[in-house]
Structures are given as structure tokens and as C-alpha cells.
Amino acid sequence: MLFRSVVNKPRFGCGHNGAPFTSPLQSLLQCYQCVKQDEHISYGDLGRAVPPFGCAFSTVPGMSHVLAVANEEGIVRLYDTECGDMQRLVVKEFMAHTNAVFDIAWVPGEHKLVTASGDQTAKLWDVKAGELIGECKGHQCSLKSVAFSKFERAVFSTGGRDGNIMVWDTRCNKKDGFYRQVNQITGAHNAIDKQTPSKVKKRKPSIRGLAPSVDSQQSVTVVIFQDEYTVISAGAVDGVVKIWDLRKNYSTYRQDPVPVKLFPYPGNSTRKLGYSSLVLDPTGTNLFASCTDDNVYMFNATGLKTDPVSVFRGHQNSTFYIKASVSPDGQFLLSGSSDHSAYIWQVSDPLAAPINLIGHCQEVTSVAWCQSDFTKIATCSDDNTVRIWRLNRSSEDSSESNKTDYVGWACKKKFEPSSMAAILCTPGKPSMIPSSSLMSSPTPATCAPSNTGDLPLPSSTPLSALLPTSKLQTPKRINNGGLGASPKQMSSSKISIKDWVTRTPKSSKGTDSKTPSPRKAFTPVEQYPIVSNARVQLPYEKRAKRRLETSSEDVEHVCLDNCCVMELEPRLKKSKLDLCSLNERDCRDDKCLRLSDLSKEFDQELSPSPSTSLHMNATDNPPTLSPLSEMKSDFVDKENSSPEKNWLSALGHKFKSDNSSPQFKSSSSPSSRNSTSKKHQPRNAPNSPVSVPTTPGSMRKICTYFFKKSE
């Protein structure tokens, strides 16, 4: 138990009586502090302060307290974190690149390190002598990440903004004085993720004198080694973490590379998001990925599931410079943040509030946890400083005057209840508040539909009116025919859109109809009005038998009066018959039945005159219905009539009866047939009962009623 022995030291962990520290290890996290002597300013070549971009503790046995820091101007400094003398604090300093150094990595167990720079190269350095061992060339854009394998000291990997992942081996011979990549993954994180290889790519000819184009859609932000043959990488915009098998030579085929495994973006953001840091725990099982959606996702790198095991929240990640680190025992996660603080989470309890390392005044970018000393943490910030945080439990007993020497301290972050509810809970339906006596609801006036389409305005409604009911009750009518009390209102969570609409007042001017009350807004609205059985049937003369407007000035036109207009009744809407064309074409035939007479008889029987109605009331015997009246009843109820009833047969019977009478023969003379006065005959044609033969032989063909006979 290395860390128990560390915290049990008299300086850090023991109490006043020398008893060992038995509290949980996470209780010590609030004891991290930074004093003025542990705050170091990062200077550039000309002596001005520049921000540091990368830091890493040495992996050499006996030199794990040495911290390497690289800044924006390409200078690398080695700090001895155990030295109390400020004059000998910096062990080594050298200009590694003429451009910014974005990442730095120590060779496992050796006094060597590799720097990744914006000058498109990576360099291998001997830190003891301060000499350059070799330079790696191959990338066409800035290098963003560099990583070594724990099992191989000569092999490392780099990722750049050109979208390529390159593997280097320092045991290979140099070509033209530079190391060349032994394996390459081209387009590892394109914006469009393709699961299958595409067609062979065509290489574009390079133009001399022009810098290569930078495609921000395929930048590789971080690469790490999982084992000797496996590399894990992440991109800037695709939101996918990919695992690659280096035993496959990806540079042989000019196709889109296919990873052996990938972790898709687990969040719900629609923006193009990426990852700024990847880190494995000491066992190599848990993979921590810092995403730009302000979350750190923990994946199981050795399992089959691609969903995150845990999610760590509370910090802010708005740039690709924010890095993460894991404690030596793998129990805690350290990360930088854009809100000027560093955060520490407990891996076993991701929902617990993290610990804040407060003191920086700008974004905290790179962080490092000493792998041989749990009590030491290093942070880099855009305020141009590097700070060393130490675990000091003696500060609990110190006075307030001694705390003025501190430039940084740790405290537990307090989550706001509203923010925690938004993170952990899904927004649900609003519930009723029992403590309030009034609840906002629409006013009666605004429940009625309006032309503007505005939403209902709030008003105060007692909660007693919002009690749930078993079903809606129909409003009762009072004695004078008006509307009674409005039905009980439904709960606000059960009201549908149709319950907000009320029926508009009818256009009828009857005295018995009244405008519905606006409080009837919560009753169901019917699409068509229901006609009461007690409704008084008005005579047909008073009903709307409207004529169509025409440009003809002949008011005696029989077509307009009898055959082309239908009464506006629901049962007659679909029984319209255009008799005008038949009348104009067939009335020229001397054997043809005049449709004007037929229409006249139809109107007379459909709308009897007042004198006829009085005569019928005076007599006891009802009049005998003619076959024409039977045809009229069939015509009126055409939609509901049976198929056996045929109006053409009635016309045939009428034609036979008129043909047998001498009155019809005299009217069918050539002189009367050629005159135009037959088209406008008087409308008082005789209406007498006709005996209808029932034998099929007496019936004529239908063509004789519509075509003229040849003379």
C-alpha cells in the first residue's frame, strides 16, 4: 500500500498523537495547496511571459520529481520539484523548436523525451546533454500529440492536423538525415465516418511553392498507446474514438482506413464535437476521453460495449488544449478546465461533486499527476504560469495569517440544485402545486376563437375547479331555453386543443337562439349542428329554393325555374339533375314528353299552393297519388331509393298515357311541332291520374325518348 505509507508520514497524514490516518483517501483531496514558491512563470526567448502548452513528469527511476514543461515559443525547461533553492530550480533549458510545442512525452525509463511542434516535425532529445538525437519528418501540418508505448522504448506515435497518424521507430536508419514513418494511417478522423473502404483515392499533384492545405474536418487531436500493437486516437469534429491495430500496414492500401473498434459519440449534441485528451488508467482497462461538450466519458477499452461506463461533469472544455491525467492508483481523475480551475473526480463515484483547484486566472490547459508521488500535481495555465500542488494536511491547524502565502487551494465544488436536476433528470410534465390556492389558466374571454390566433391569457382559477372528473357533463338547459351552468373543467394537463375552441354564434336571426356562453369552452365541439326532433318544418315556399344568377333577361325561362336549381336541403344536395340539356334537345320531337310539363307537375306536387292545401284540409278523402308523384318521391329521395325504382319507367308510363289520349295527338301536329311557342307553355298543365300497365311488353326502349324519329 504505497499511498497509505505516503499519507501516514508525519508531515502529511499522521495526527498529533502519531496515530495513522484511517479516513478514506478522497478526504485528503481538499488538502492540496500551492504556495508562492511553487508558482513558476513561463518565459520566452526574449524574456517575456508566454503560456505553457505541455507538461509531463519523468518516468526515469529516481528522477520522477523532474517536470518537463514546453511553452509557446518552443522552449523546454526541466524543473526539480524537490529542490528548495530557487537558483537551482531549473535543471535544464533548451530551445527545442522555433515554433510552439503542443505536446511532450518521456521515453519510458530513459533520460530522453520527444517534442511535437507546430513546425510539422517531432524531435528526440537527450535531456542530460541537451542534444538533439533525431528529427522526424512526414507530417504536412502541425503536430498535436505524441505518445510512447510502455512496452517499447523505440516506438512512438504522433497525430497532426493533416489527419494522419504516423508511427516512428528510432531503430531504423535515417533517410536524408531524418527519421521516416514506418506506418501511417491517412484520414483517420474524417468528418464523414465510413465503415467500409471506398474506392481507390487519386493522389493530387503537389504544387511547389504552396503550403499544403489544412483540412480542419480531419484533424487528429490526441493519440495514445494501449499496448504494444494498439493505438487509440480521437479527432476534432467527428466525435469518435477509434482503436487501431498496428500489425496492419495501413499505408499499403490507398483506401479509407477501418479501425478494429470505435466508440461513437455518446452525447446528444448536434454540433460538431471532438476530444481534446485521452488517458488510460494503470490497468489499461478504463479509457477517459475529454470531450468538448464539457463531459469526460469513461469507456471500457477491453470490453465489447461501446457505451460509456461513467460520465464526469462539472468542468468546462471549450478548447483542444485541455488535457487530463489519472492518479497513480487509478482512483482519481484530474482535468483542466476553461473556467480557470482544475478538477479532481473520484472514479468510483462520478456523480459526487468534484474537487476544485482554485488559483489560476486563465484557462487551465495541461495537467500532470506524478506517477510515483500521489501528493504532487502540476498544472499549466494561459496566465503564463506553472504551478505545483502539494498535499499538506498541516494547513488544517495553521492560522489565517499563514494562509496568505498560498496562491492556490482546493475546495469542493457546489452543484446548484437546478443544474443537477437538469443533468440527472429528464424534463417531465408540469405537475399541479398543491400548496398554491390559485393556478394560472385561460380566461373565459380568450377561450373563444379569434381571427388573430393569439394564445389564451393567464388568469387566476381556484384549484377546486381543476379537480379531475370522471367524464364531461353536458350542460343543462334552464326553463327559458338558455344555457345553464358550465361543465366542470378538466385538469390543465389533460386539456386538448379542441377544448379551447368554442362554437361561434349562428347567423340565424331566430328569437329562440342565444349566443353560447364563453364558459362553454371546455365542452366538446361538434362539427355539424344537431337538428332537434321538435323543430317546426316550414313550408317549401319559405325555404331557400334559390336560383342561379344568369345573364339572360328572360324571366320566363322554364329551365331556370324548374330544372337547373336544387333546393338547399341536406337530403337533396346529392340528387341534382340537369334537365336543361334534355329539354332543349328532346322537346323538338313530336313523340317526346315535354320536360317542362313534367317539371311543372313535380314542382306543383312538391310545393302545393295555399288554395290547394286549404282544399285538401277541407275534404276528408285524401287525393289519389299519380305515378308522377311516385316518381317525384323517388327523385327527391334518390340517394336512399332502392335499385328497383326507375324514373325512366315512370316517364314511359306517362308517355303511353298521353299518346293514347286525343289531346296529345292534336298537339303533336307539324305546325305545332315547328312553332317555338311550345318551349314556353303555360305552367298549369292538367294533372290527372294515369293507369300504369305492368306488362313488360307495353314498355318502349329508352332510345325512343331521346332521339328524333326519321320521317
Swiss-Prot record:
Amino acid composition bias (Polar residues), ranges on this chain: 504-516, 606-627, 684-697
Region (Disordered): 473-524, 601-698
Top-level taxon of the source organism: Eukaryota
Span of the annotated motif DDB1-binding motif: 168-171, 244-247
Transmembrane segments: none
Gene3D superfamilies documented for this protein: YVTN repeat-like/Quinoprotein amine dehydrogenase
Motif range (Nuclear localization signal): 197-204
Chief place where the protein resides: nucleus
UniProt keyword terms in alphabetical order: Biological rhythms, Chromosome, Cytoplasm, Cytoskeleton, DNA damage, DNA replication, Nucleus, Repeat, Ubl conjugation pathway, WD repeat
Pathway it works in: Protein modification; protein ubiquitination
Residue ranges with Low complexity bias: 658-675
Basic and acidic residues compositional bias, start-end: 631-642
WD repeats: from-to residues: 47-89, 96-135, 138-178, 215-254, 270-309, 314-355, 359-398
Family, as annotated: Belongs to the WD repeat cdt2 family.
Subunit-level organization: Component of the DCX(DTL) E3 ubiquitin ligase complex, at least composed of cul4 (cul4a or cul4b), ddb1, dtl/cdt2 and rbx1.
Protein name: Denticleless protein homolog B
Natural source organism: Xenopus laevis
